[in-house]
Amino acid sequence: MNKLVHIIGAGLAGSEAAWQLVKNGFNVVIHEMKRVKKSPVHVSENFAELVCSNSLKSTDLKNAEGLLKAEMEIWGSLILECAYNNSVPAGKALAVDREKFSQCVTEKLLQTGLVKVVWEEVEKPYTDDIWIIATGPTTDGKLAEWIREQTGGFFNFFDAVAPIVSAESINMDVCFVADRYGVGTGDYINCPMTKEEYERFWNELVNAQVIEIEDFDRKLLFERCQPIEEIARSGKDAMRYGPLRPVGIVDPKTGKEPYAVIQLRKENVEGTMYNIVGFQTRLKWGEQRRIIQLIPGLENAEILRYGVMHRNSYIDSPKVLDEYLRLKKMPNVFFAGQITGVEGYVESAMTGLYVGLNISRLILGKDMIKFPEKTMCGALVRYITTAPELKPMYANFGLLGGGKDREKIALKALDEMKKFYQITSLTIGG
């Protein structure tokens, strides 16, 4: 079998798949369009660009996201290696310096000498080699048309991106540094609100002008990236029980919890940029500036990046992909990333890892493998390939069945993955 593998898209899934292949000595051609045409959400030419947030979520094993990471580390995940090496303080969450993280992934892959980058917009797989389609949820153009022909169409949902402000424009006479419940190393800046300030903020937010998006449907909003204005419209106190909840945060000036609080998290290692946590939005840019400057401590905020919203698409994986994320009607084509129906940075990378591992085995004439179903990786892959009605899914303990002792479940899953790795891991290429 030809040892050359083509990957369309150098996002988290495509980059992770490439890493698993080059680790085993195989040549990879990455087809990336960003130098020719950028999607609405990308800004640089580096691989593995983070869009929605700079947080890869929890590292705690009692959290499903933490378990997912721990399992992937067993297989030598490039995404996690670069994430940990370029992390910024964020309590129990793994947050990264976006630019340095993407640069790390790019350099690691190119330094192998086995990766060739072709800057082009691919319309469809055009050789008989193995192809991985990892173009992400904003796939469009001729390639989207080709995928639609092969799969019967796309499902859609919408998500959004939060704004970033400059650190020097934050008024620390008003804001204060604290972590929820005192857990962490002072990783968040908090903007406290009184009841009057909150109510004014809410009133202005629900009446602010938004950017009209073609075919926008509130029913298609993804839960974890709900625009702040949509949360606000669902009820006057909805934000106080969501991203603006004050529970566990004490204002040192009053010794009490504020009525509401907006948190800011470091965006880069130097701490010169902060993103507004949970403030994904589709407000018009002028309105964003006006609303953000209503937040106590951000009266003179310099906005370095405005929030945006975009449509995400994914295929009907249970219908069109096999258990290895391979197109049933075209066995030389695999899919990876959010286009398969997973949701989240790390989940996306995991599918790339899975596909990269299995293509390595396929080229070597070995049987492909399925992660054990009682691992988080295995449960996620099983869900997206068997769900009766596929909805975007992120790591959660519900996928592993019942049981209240999450730590016990996680340790058992981790032990199972370690044993599976010892039995099935490849030792070629190094």
Swiss-Prot record:
Cofactor: FAD
Record's keyword annotation contains Repressor: no
UniProt EC number: 2.1.1.74
GO terms for cellular component: cytosol
Binding-site residues, FAD: G9, A10, G11, L12, A13, G14
Listed NCBIfam families: gid_trmFO (TIGR00137), PRK05335.1 (NF003739)
Protein's UniProt name: Methylenetetrahydrofolate--tRNA-(uracil-5-)-methyltransferase TrmFO
Organism whose genome encodes this protein: Fervidobacterium nodosum (strain ATCC 35602 / DSM 5306 / Rt17-B1)
